[in-house]
Amino acid sequence: MAELTTIARPYAKAAFDVAVEHNAVDTWAEMLTFAALVSENETMQPLLTGSLASTKLAALFISVCGEQINEQGQNLIKVMAENGRLKVLPAVSELFAQYRNEWAKEVEADVVSAAELSSEQQQQISNSLEKRLARKVKLNCSTDAALIAGVIIKAGDLVIDGSVRGKLSRLSEKLQS
């Protein structure tokens, strides 16, 4: 995964710079998401790792994407095909989304709770994170009964484990040391 990120980073950065320059960040995000889905398609996978000439592969990929990819997006596809990097499109899309969130002063936070959170509880968590991170927060909520009670919040590099399972685990570690 780290290797894919390293390979994808320059493509994502270049795409993001072009998107900002042309005031088309959302358009680029949609294009890259679509292109990533195409590259992950089980029919397309063998072609990406096969011996098809890069120009033919790029033309095929662009024809499959159709009108979902504009001329600048097509140029990115061509460059990535020439370098044999179309298989990293999902990582490019993911990195682009991270750059977009950073640029827009937004962050996605994954909140895992033992029981479903009410909209009021979600709003309280969102408000607290917005104050702490100085960013607009978008919550992705899920449940996991194995937490016993409480929540685990992951937002960027920040991890807050307020679950009973986490507290029991930390207590167990202290008792064993």
Curated annotation (Swiss-Prot):
GO molecular function: proton-transporting ATP synthase activity, rotational mechanism
Domain of life where this protein originates: Bacteria
Membrane protein topology class: Peripheral membrane protein
Record field: transmembrane: none
Broad class of the protein's primary localization: membrane
One Gene Ontology cellular component annotation held by this UniProt entry: plasma membrane
Protein location: Cell inner membrane
Matches recorded under Pfam families: OSCP
Keywords for this protein: ATP synthesis, Cell inner membrane, Cell membrane, CF(1), Hydrogen ion transport, Ion transport, Membrane, Transport
Coiled coil residues, start to end: none
Keyword check for Metal-binding: no
Membrane listed as a keyword: yes
Record text on subunit structure and interactions: F-type ATPases have 2 components, F(1) - the catalytic core - and F(0) - the membrane proton channel. F(1) has five subunits: alpha(3), beta(3), gamma(1), delta(1), epsilon(1). F(0) has three main subunits: a(1), b(2) and c(10-14). The alpha and beta chains form an alternating ring which encloses part of the gamma chain. F(1) is attached to F(0) by a central stalk formed by the gamma and epsilon chains, while a peripheral stalk is formed by the delta and b chains.
Assigned protein family: Belongs to the ATPase delta chain family.
HAMAP family: ATP_synth_delta_bact (MF_01416)
Function statement: F(1)F(0) ATP synthase produces ATP from ADP in the presence of a proton or sodium gradient. F-type ATPases consist of two structural domains, F(1) containing the extramembraneous catalytic core and F(0) containing the membrane proton channel, linked together by a central stalk and a peripheral stalk. During catalysis, ATP synthesis in the catalytic domain of F(1) is coupled via a rotary mechanism of the central stalk subunits to proton translocation.
Protein name: ATP synthase subunit delta
Species, as recorded: Shewanella sp. (strain ANA-3)
Lineage: Bacteria, Pseudomonadati, Pseudomonadota, Gammaproteobacteria, Alteromonadales
